[in-house]
Amino acid sequence: MSLNRSEKEAVISDVTSLAAKAQTLVMAEYRGITVADMTKLRSEARSKGVTLSVLKNTLARRAVAGSAFEIVGDQMTGPLIYGFSEDAVAAAKVVADFAKTNDKLVIRGGAFGGKALDVNGVKQLANIPSKEVLLAQLLGLMQSPISRTARVLAALAEKRGGGEAAPADAPAEAQAA
């Protein structure tokens, strides 16, 4: 199906706005993937905040021109699906995880932070934990010294007082009587 000029401009405009918001672009060849598998990939991507698009490569090149993803314009050949995500690792994770279970989806490359990524770069990006997991790990690291100190103080109080109530409680009871 051929697009007329106004439809092409609309596609370019949509993809340009996607590229402006996105941190990551992942490209994968989808030759031979069934419609059911593609639907499953798209629904998984949608749930993770990733936008997948099958575009004509010339339209994709024009859409990313002037953006951080322009550096991968020369890699835009063949039947590709483009994954854009605002989360730095989401697009790479979705595509790499799907490629593990479906050998017909072949990662071709991508871009992140103004740098082109090869296949290994996309896979390394996919192995980075998500933002939520990283924040949870950071919080755990920050809480660890505090909880250790609390355990040491509790053990010290147990050792000194033999498990009795703190001495501050006794004067409060005497004043109430």
Curated annotation (Swiss-Prot):
The keyword Ribosomal protein applies. Keywords: Ribonucleoprotein, Ribosomal protein, RNA-binding, rRNA-binding. PROSITE patterns: RIBOSOMAL_L10 (PS01109). One of its GO terms (molecular function) is structural constituent of ribosome. GO terms for cellular component: large ribosomal subunit. GO terms for biological process: translation. It holds the Pfam family Ribosomal_L10. The keyword Ribosomal protein applies. It comes from the Bacteria. Part of the ribosomal stalk of the 50S ribosomal subunit. The N-terminus interacts with L11 and the large rRNA to form the base of the stalk. The C-terminus forms an elongated spine to which L12 dimers bind in a sequential fashion forming a multimeric L10(L12)X complex. Belongs to the universal ribosomal protein uL10 family. Forms part of the ribosomal stalk, playing a central role in the interaction of the ribosome with GTP-bound translation factors. This is Large ribosomal subunit protein uL10. The gene is rplJ.
